[in-house]
Amino acid sequence: MPLIIVSGYPSSGKTTRSNELKKALEDRIHQNIDNTKDYRVIIINDESLNIEKETYRESKNEKAARGLLYSAVQRELSKSTFVICDALNYIKGFRYQLYCESKSMYTTHCVIHVAVPQDLCRKFNSNKEQPYPDDVLEQLMFRYEEPNGMTRWDSPLFTVLHDDASCPIDDIWSVLIHNKNVKPNQATMVKPPAEVNYLYELDKTTQDVIMLILDNSNDTSLITVPGSKLQIALPSVTVSLPLLQRLRRQFIQINRQQSYNTNVLKEMFVEFLNGQFETLD
């Protein structure tokens, strides 16, 4: 059932909003609204997985923590479970990876951005019993990649300000249960290319990236994609051609009904691969 990705600065109040949302969803389930009486709501976060805040000081430990979080989400996603992923989720590539997981499970998803000024996060953090170390807090806020509702993996996007009374539960329920998406503005709609051209670009772009990996995997663990700032971070284990082709087919299956230009496709595929490779380390 639905995946709710909560994102925001550290100490921005994400867990408070997640608990608030959990209660609101459970109230509706208790009332059997939309025949949901057999549903349940679960929150997955650093606390439930015993991930210490010091983990975010070293990139290797942080990658392992993201892998743990991703695996927990995978286990809990089911046809009768609301999964609230209450974590930093500050890397767009990881949010895209979670989006792909929800797509593969044929379920809905949304992103909730808990938008709180940095100064207020610092204040909240200083008042915590177990705060983030100051340097870790600053690093995480600096690296934060804010959700963008114009991208498919960050949409539908709900932004909750620090002084908002509550999350927009009615809208969230409609998106997750009734699958009602906000109608895009005509000025911002992407006109889809002819289907045959799009599928050709999807096939060619992904194949080009695979060939780039095969041509360079023996020389470096960080491959720069020509003509862009994109980098492919290879895992410590050997990446075989069958694995790459399987991931390529999975990506194509997820995106064949969409419409993106070549540059966006390349970025999405690189983000997808980086997310998958992280789970292999």
Swiss-Prot record:
- Where does the record say this protein resides? Cytoplasm; Nucleus
Q: Supply one GO molecular-function term.
A: ATP binding
Keyword Nucleotide-binding: yes or no? yes
**Gene name of this polypeptide:** kti12
Which example biological process does GO assign this protein? tRNA wobble uridine modification
User: Which InterPro entries does the entry link to?
Assistant: KTI12/PSTK (IPR013641), P-loop_NTPase (IPR027417)
Q: Which PANTHER family did the record assign?
A: PTHR12435
Species the sequence originates in = Schizosaccharomyces pombe (strain 972 / ATCC 24843) (Fission yeast)
- Key words of the record: ATP-binding, Cytoplasm, Nucleotide-binding, Nucleus, Transcription, Transcription regulation
What is the protein name for this chain?
Answer: Protein kti12
Describe its assembly.
Answer: Interacts with the elongator complex.
Q: Which family does it belong to?
A: Belongs to the KTI12 family.
**Task performed by this protein:** Elongator complex-associated factor that is not a structural subunit but rather transiently contacts the complex. Required for an early step in synthesis of 5-methoxycarbonylmethyl (mcm5) and 5-carbamoylmethyl (ncm5) groups present on uridines at the wobble position in tRNA.
**Residues the record lists as binding ATP:** 8-15
The organism's superkingdom is given as Eukaryota
- Is the keyword Zinc-finger in the record? no
Q: Name one GO cellular component term.
A: nucleus
